[in-house]
Amino acid sequence: MFQSDLFPAGEQLPSMPLAYAIGTRVAALLASGRHLTRTDISGLFADKTGVMDWGSAWTIDDYNNAVEIGALLWLRESSRIGLATSIHEAEARFDWLEAALPPRHVRSEAQVELQQFSTPPMLAWLMAKAAAVCAQDTLLEPSAGNGALALWGCLQNA
């Protein structure tokens, strides 16, 4: 089962974390074929919190997590990418995803201090493909991230 603090299992948490709530909306917009801008994502936060700019109701960490969670949810639910997908086909879909999301050049001081940098989605996929992850495997997500490495194991029921 794929689970982390930002991908709750069942009814474990009393409320949905803000970054996950926004991430689900990002994934739905991606699934509809939409490309998103920073303003679009800030607008999603504004819809949820009433505040358009980060700083009080939401943080740059929330923003980065929401975008990453949205991408991971889209990869899991809508991308049609699996470990059997050809490199060329997967690359085209990963390229679309990268073009559909705004670049994330801003990191919080805590992220920089702790050297928290996201695993690029295609790199995580390539690692799982090279490892030939299968249902008999047990995977551990070694990072403090949102599960980019564990996602592909989840799709293989590992």
What is each PLM-predicted segment?
Residues 2-5:
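Short acidic, low-complexity intrinsically disordered linear motifs used
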Residues 7-157:
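Class I S-adenosyl-L-methionine
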